[in-house]
UniProtKB/Swiss-Prot annotation, chains A, B:
Keyword NADP: yes
Known catalytic reactions: L-glutamate 5-semialdehyde + phosphate + NADP(+) = L-glutamyl 5-phosphate + NADPH + H(+)
CDD domains, per database record: ALDH_F18-19_ProA-GPR
Keywords: Amino-acid biosynthesis, Cytoplasm, NADP, Oxidoreductase, Proline biosynthesis
UniProt similarity note: Belongs to the gamma-glutamyl phosphate reductase family.
GO MF, any single term: NADP binding
Protein name in the entry: Gamma-glutamyl phosphate reductase
Enzyme Commission no: 1.2.1.41
Record has Oxidoreductase as a keyword: yes
Lineage: Bacteria, Pseudomonadati, Pseudomonadota, Gammaproteobacteria, Alteromonadales
Chain's role: Catalyzes the NADPH-dependent reduction of L-glutamate 5-phosphate into L-glutamate 5-semialdehyde and phosphate. The product spontaneously undergoes cyclization to form 1-pyrroline-5-carboxylate.
Pathway: Amino-acid biosynthesis; L-proline biosynthesis; L-glutamate 5-semialdehyde from L-glutamate: step 2/2
Length: 415, 415
């Protein structure tokens, strides 16, 4: 596996993609959609081998389900590709244009970033997602999926490359690191001559590894330790519905709720209601001491570190706070900066909350589950960024672009 | 030097700055301006000690001049502070606001980044610049200047801190790493719990060190290997003026010209003119073989690596290219992505150039010297970014901010 020459080829492909118009890029995406349909049997059969190997390796049912790419799911993926075709291409937009006093006609033009390296786990549909969103925005990409789906991914990338070739675009626009050697991830992170951005889509360990070992800018994200604060003025019935939605709808995703902070003035009344509402849904309350004192054996006492965990299951941390200030201090200390919200009917407190809390998404009286590219109307989602530079929160097509300044003069020198 | 507690204090200060209004931030800047005036003697005297130590250490006259902060220069710095007061505060702006079909009122709000770490060299005015631009945008900062100006910098930061205290803002909003121990830079780069962005302002070695050792996003920049391509259709007289401006006006800065590419059809005629125009200004032409063959002993033959160097002096690389394509290939290989331009009267070629070249700033018939915050009308400049994420080219106040998504619902759950 010669990663350097793979990087060089990706960079060269990126130069061609950068000057490819929307029509041709969309033709490439349609060719990919058709090729995925035409190669359905090959893809599904490679996936079956992955599933079989996963079973032999003793993977859990939940993980095996994430690996699965059957006919139905593949049809869904193809339909997603066609949705991306319909989205506007952000590349080429000019903005902040002005004629300066010094005579320079200046503007910013939106351009592709170049080469995007994506390291991800498990789900093979990510392979198609990332390839398609990168191509739509004129970026080349280098993909590195998990070892559990390597057979599926290799076939998928072959199909994509053949489709690219059929429309006259470089096959090297989408490349896959076919070895499961972990050292290659470390090598990829050092290839700043060829790769412009790294997106790790995976657990906290992968995020940390990329942050600490990359010479290339890394979009850290997808780790959600999310909070809701039920203020004393909250409409308790509505709060129960929002908390249930945030916790139960899809507990394994990053915008699911980890911790509910409850104002002490309502804790005695609200916490038993909370338990009555959530217990039938399978939720276990993990309570700090004050909440535990109220809930008794309806809750498990929280251990050290519990309030820093992304649960990814039906556990819910519960903590009684003395006031707004204590709620803010808790969020500041424990939030991963993904999504945090307040449930309140007090206008002043609500405003204060959105002024003070600095997470990628801050909510008043809404579920944290809204932090999502499609919910936000972005049409697509590459990742959810929890860092502060370049992009925050759900990243759509625009976040796969950068800009360049264009200055036009009539033979202009600086005075 | 306990860098961890310094970082913690900066983070805490950043929370307060983030909710401080423009009026109070401007009052702090005016207090700083007044304090710099009131402490002029103390500052100038500390700077004299730095200059004396520099002389004893055998620093060059050019470097000693960069260290100098006398009464006149300090007055200039104070005047710059008052200019920043007059600029609009980007913090708090809301944009991309929309009411989504799912009922969520969504917008992005511009907010401070948090804590900015800046590592810089030589010039003590950078201490004031960075502190003032950070405060204006509600960011705390941790500064680490060069050892040559440590006495000046310590006094400047003391003056700033006293001014902050006088208006009731945390002194820890601006902190200085008072030790010259190089290991502390490495430690700062790992403090991702407290620092949100690193800006290295210095030579290529510092930039590389930060990129390779930081867990925190780094804004790489300020290294300019800049090109102009004189196409065959160029107005030669005007081209001479632009090339002279780009090379000679201020050869030690990053937007100065490194390399002139000349179309072979005009090389025989243009290169001797170029020499006649630039030689009296002290420029030495460093030519590749074809250009050397034309220029003879009017040029020095380029050595390996010369076309990758940022000259920072009156040398100018000169290369004859066969056509547009060869010019582009040279720029792709050797440009640092700072500023590159074409000199031409051919509309099609000009357009092709700005489409194909992906540098932070791309010019048609204008000097590379325009790549500058004040020339671009940004009012201020924190750094010139040559990387592609977050900000490209001159970074003004807005580039010291990020955004958060604000979602407001009437007790809204995700369907």
């Amino acid at each position: 596996m010669d990663l350097q020459s793979l990087g060089k080829l990706a960079k060269e492909a990126s130069y061609e993609l950068a000057i490819t118009g929307s029509e041709k890029k969309n033709a490439a995406l349609e060719a990919i959609a058709l090729a995925l349909e035409a190669n359905q049997d090959k893809i599904v059969s490679a996936n079956k081998e992955d599933i079989q190997a996963g079973k032999e390796a003793g993977l859990t049912e939940a993980l095996l389900d994430r690996l699965l790419l059957d006919e139905t799911r593949l049809a869904g993926v193809v339909s997603d590709v066609r949705s991306v075709i319909k989205l506007d291409d952000p590349v080429g937009e000019e903005f902040d244009g002005k004629l300066l006093e010094n005579g320079l006609k200046l503007s910013k033009r939106r351009v592709p970033i170049g080469v995007i390296g994506v390291i991800y786990e498990a789900r093979p549909n990510v392979t198609i997602d990332i390839a398609v969103l990168s191509l739509k925005t004129g970026n080349a990409c280098i993909l590195r999926g998990g070892k559990e789906t390597i057979r599926s991914n290799i076939v998928l990338v072959e199909v994509i490359q053949a489709a690219l070739k059929s429309v006259g675009l470089p096959e090297t626009s989408v490349q896959y690191i076919k070895s499961t050697d972990r050292a290659l991830v470390g090598e990829l992170l050092k290839m700043d001559d060829y790769v412009d951005m790294i997106i790790p889509r995976g657990n906290a360990g992968l995020q940390k590894f990329c942050k600490e070992n990359s010479n290339i800018p890394v979009i850290v994200g997808g780790i959600g330790v999310c909070h809701l604060f039920a203020d004393k003025s909250v409409d308790q019935e509505k709060a129960l519905a929002i908390v249930a939605n945030a916790k139960v709808q899809r507990p394994t995703v990053c915008n699911a709720l980890e911790t509910l902070l409850v104002h002490q003035d309502i804790a005695e009344e609200f916490l038993p209601k909370l338990h009555a509402h959530l217990a039938p849904m399978g939720v276990t309350l993990i309570a700090e001491e004050k909440a535990k004192a109220i809930l008794g054996d309806k809750a498990t006492l929280a251990e050290a570190g519990d309030f820093d965990r992304e649960w990814l299951c039906l556990n819910l941390g519960v903590k009684v706070v003395a006031d707004f200030h204590e709620a803010i201090m808790h969020i500041r200390t424990h939030s991963s900066g993904h999504s945090d919200g307040i449930l309140t009917n007090d206008f002043t407190i609500a405003n204060k909350f959105i002024n003070v809390v600095n997470s990628a998404a801050v909510y008043i009286n809404a579920s944290t589950r809204f932090t999502d590219g499609s919910q936000f109307g972005l049409g697509a989602e590459v990742a959810v960024s929890t860092q502060k530079l370049h992009a925050r929160g759900p990243m759509g097509l625009q976040e796969l672009t950068t800009y360049k300044w264009i200055g036009i003069g009539e033979n202009l020198i600086r005075p």
